[in-house]
Amino acid sequence: MLMRQKGIIIKAVDYGESDKIITILNEHGAKVPLMARRAKKVKTGLQAQTQLFVYGLFIYNQWRGMGTLNSVDVISQHYKLQMDLYVSSYASLAAETIERSMDEGDIAPYNYQLLQFVLEKIESGTSAQLMSVVVMLKCMKRFGFTASFNRCAVSGNDTQADLIGYSFKFDGAISRQEASKDVHAVILSNKTLYLLDVLQKLPIDKMNSLNIHQEIIDEMSDIILMLYREYAGMFFKSQKLINQLKRLEQ
């Protein structure tokens, strides 16, 4: 059966000498794996069209199991996401988070909206690292956990100015007054905790201007990755390249 669906490539894996297996997140919020034959060959024209983040109309044959890609009518190549290694790595982290949050057969229209929103924001100049944080905050429940940043997990104190870190012992933010009860709590700035809470709760269609200092973004990114490792046992492939790039800077 010949299928035509709009979608965004969220995963691309080399298969053999000349083929690729791509996964698109289609406009209905479903993951669709496709075999792209000879996609690594320049002459086929599919090499550029099967890159990560390509948004387009995908035409493919679907019978049982994996479909076979025929062609792609590209709507947006998202070139800016490919031009900078840092940008590309954090955009990949966002895409990987969404891809791994979904089981085979899942239908999640919100994930498609989230991915489109994030890629458009990055293209317009918003920090890709910040956008990866937004995605990971929005996808937490799909990985089976949540996190609270707006009140002390020990005392219930919800005075934002008193919160100084995150406690894995008590599974939540911890206040200055209770800090002695967990000497291993991850110390965070008050602003980091506040913004994590805001971004977690704020609908994406209300996120207009996102201007946050890099130090705060770094703190948010670090604690979010720690949460995913601790609560979901997740380590993302994209994170390996990010870690390598950070080591090169040191």
UniProtKB/Swiss-Prot annotation:
Pfam family, one: RecO_C
GO CC terms: bacterial nucleoid
Keyword DNA repair tagged: yes
Keyword DNA repair in annotation: yes
A Gene Ontology biological process term: double-strand break repair
Domain of life according to the entry: Bacteria
InterPro entries assigned: ARFGAP/RecO, DNA_rep/recomb_RecO_N, NA-bd_OB-fold, RecO, RecO_C
Keyword terms: DNA damage, DNA recombination, DNA repair
Cross-referenced HAMAP family: RecO (MF_00201)
Job of this protein: Involved in DNA repair and RecF pathway recombination.
Family: Belongs to the RecO family.
Listed name of the protein: DNA repair protein RecO
Species: Staphylococcus aureus (strain Mu3 / ATCC 700698)
Lineage, opening ranks: Bacteria, Bacillati, Bacillota, Bacilli, Bacillales
Encoding gene (name): recO
